[in-house]
Structures are given as C-alpha cells and as structure tokens.
Amino acid sequence: MDLKGKNILVVGLARTGVAVARFLAAQGARVTVTDLRDEAALAGPLEQLAGHPVSYVLGRHDEADFAAAETVVVSPGVPQESPYLQAARRAGREVITEIELASRFITAPLVAITGTNGKTTTTTLTGELFAGCGFRTFVGGNIGNPLIELVETGAAVDRVVVEISSFQLEWIRSFRPTVAVLLNITEDHLDRYATYQEYIDAKARIFKNQTASDWAVLNVDDPIVAGLAGRTCAAVFPMSRQRELGEGIFYRDGAIIFRHAGRQERFPTDRFRITGVHNIENIMASLAAALLLGCDADRALACVEAFGGLPHRMELVRELNGVRYFEDSKATNVGSVEKALASFNDITLIAGGKDKGGSYAPLAGLVAERVRHMILIGEAKDRMARELGHLTDTRMAVTLEDAVELAASLTQPGGVVLFSPACSSFDMFRDYEERAQRFRAAVDALSPGGTP
C-alpha cells in the first residue's frame, strides 16, 4: 500500500494516534492530527512527534479537515454518529481505525480475538503459546502495543495475536484474520449501541473478510455465538465446555481434548494455575488457535501450566478465618459475573458500580442457587436490588470498605467473598484498577477476628 503524498487525518493523539502519525509521516503521507485537547494537555504526545512532518488542529475539530482527507484514521472510542465522521463519509472518504491500517502491511498469520469477556486473558495466553513453541510473536491490538507499532518497527514475526474490540471492528474494511476467535457475547456497551443487536453485529464483523482457508473458533455453548456460524466463510472450529465434539476442542473428565482431522491431543487441567469455568473456555480458545497454526501440543501444555493469569480477574487476595476473598474488579458486565458465580458455592457477593444499561436478570438463577449474601454499592445498587434482591439476603453499603467489613461479618468458614461488580467503576473510582486496589486494601486491613 503506497501512502506517499496521501492526505491522511489522524483523529486522537493518545499512544495509538502518535504511533499512527509517526508511521504515516515516515511513509511520506501528508499527515494532519486533530484532537479536542489543547497543546498544553498534549505536551507529552507532541514531544514524541517532534521533528516529524505533521500538521496539527488542536483544541477543536474542523469538519473541513474530515471532508478533505483521503483517509481518516479514527480512535475506536469515537462513535459512528460523530458529525465529523459523518462529514467524511458524506464526502466519500475512507474512515478506518489503526487495526485496519496496520493489517494492510502484515503478512504473518494473524489471530484476532474478540468477545464480551476473556479477550485479554485469551490474547495474552495465545501469545505465550506461540512464543513458547518457538514462533516469533507479536501480541497487541486493544491491549498493550498498538498493531501499527509492529509495522512501524518492521520486526520480522511468525505469528501475530491481537485483541480486538467491537469499536475497532466497526471500521474494518479488509481486515482478515487467519484465525478469528469469538469467545462469548453478552449485553455490554449499551451506552454506545442503540440495541443489543447492534453490538452483536459489530462483533460478527470479525468474520467479514475471511475465506475458506481461514478458521473461525466459536464457543458453541453460547447460543448467540453459535448462531453466527453462518456469517463466516471460514472453516468453523467449535469449542465447548459442556459437550463432546467430534471435531473441535472440548472439556471432559478433567481434561481439554483437541480433535482435528483425525488428530487428538489431551491436556489435563489438574496442574493449571488459573481456575474457574471462564478460564477453561479461555484456555480452550487459546489452544485451538495455537494448534491450528502449528504449535506442538506438549510445549503448549507446558505453557498453559506455567501461565498465572492476569491481574483483577478472579484473583485470590487472602484466606482469613476459613473464608477466601476473591477480587474480580475487571468483571464490568453481567456475562463475566455469571462465569465467576458458576465457579463457587456459598458466596457473599459484593457488586455494583456505574450502571451500563444492561439487564441483571441473567444472574438470577446463579444468585438464587449460589449466593448466600449480596452486598450492593454504587449508583446501580437500587436497580440491582430491584432485579435480584428478592433472591437472597441483600444488604446495601455506602463504601467498598463498608461492604468488605459487612461481608467479613456475614460469611461463615468455607464460604467465599467475591467482589465481582457487574458494573463499571467510574461512579466511585478512577478505573477498575483503583477499585481493585481499594478492595485488596480493605481485605488486607481485616484482622483475624474479621474486622479492621
């Protein structure tokens, strides 16, 4: 793809925008960067672009810039309804994200992983599997390094693994993964999408450009994911935690079984360091992608057994007085909380935060069956209480610290205190990481008697 002399507008000057602008300028494009933040707020990014032939429109956007550019490279956080993007589209301009741009320069087999939950763990583990099996591997996308940084450096790689969000998928045109992994779909981002179906359709775009020589790894236990099999031209490779498959990857009798073209590999799970039903699914997806693209089964098993997981995803913080305290602050939607609840019994659940607009009703069965006490916090607590509070003993707390103290007083030995919010953190905290740290500090502050 020849970029020399092309008029390209880069929208947003965060890390990805800086990398895109730098790459485009090096390719000889005529680059303009626009950001609603002013020069003072962008001192760091501007310093990184010093010396590069880039023009700036800062503190505002100008529709004329969007209409004049041949291509607009937009941050995935900008909604399609933006009047500036609408101006570009009315003028017939190409609007893409960094993932689409970068993919046009990549020749190595590419694994793209999406889903409502589990993307980051699965992406990270898949990268570990390829690297552990001797492949030069790049891991990035919606996590860590922007994909364009691989293109910019010109590094030679054998495999590329990217996490990709629904927002990024909205703008793809030719992006084509060799293996597309769809883990699950549950209600999320309804503050961005007008309907749940719009969100589903955005996720399904991961298959848009696949051909019969590609693979689509689908979690067929999820009825919505299973129903999308007809949207891909790729060969479907199913995965299931609930039933045996003649072809695909599945869980049975304490082991993950991979079956493909007469080959069978068995991966016992007893030595895995990450636990929970959701992690069995994440591991199955990673193994499927890795083995389909040439990984050795024995080396892959060793990598899985060594993998310790990622922070803030159902981590054991402490065991005190026979009670285990788990921090799952990354569980910002109902689907992820479902998987957490399915992993334990005798639960004291701490949940709540900023409401994201979806229904909490899918949790009803698990709350009734497995949750002995539920303690609610944050803006969403009243609605959560209305939808779920009648199913178990339900209390309210003003702060997270109060909730931890209350949980410690209610939970009997052998029980689990699970902080799995089902909501975003922005009503009370800077982000889910600060929320996690506050929970951990509150748990660490408990005395052997169960109170601070």
Swiss-Prot record:
Its main location: cytoplasm. InterPro entries: Mur-like_cat_sf, Mur_ligase_C, Mur_ligase_C_dom_sf, Mur_ligase_cen, MurD. The keyword Nucleotide-binding applies. Its EC number is 6.3.2.9. It catalyses: UDP-N-acetyl-alpha-D-muramoyl-L-alanine + D-glutamate + ATP = UDP-N-acetyl-alpha-D-muramoyl-L-alanyl-D-glutamate + ADP + phosphate + H(+). GO terms for biological process: cell division; cell wall organization; peptidoglycan biosynthetic process; regulation of cell shape. ATP binds at G115, T116, N117, G118, K119, T120, T121. One of its GO terms (cellular component) is cytoplasm. It is found in: Cytoplasm. Pathway: Cell wall biogenesis; peptidoglycan biosynthesis. HAMAP family: MurD. Cell wall formation. Catalyzes the addition of glutamate to the nucleotide precursor UDP-N-acetylmuramoyl-L-alanine (UMA). This is UDP-N-acetylmuramoylalanine--D-glutamate ligase. It comes from Geobacter sulfurreducens (strain ATCC 51573 / DSM 12127 / PCA).
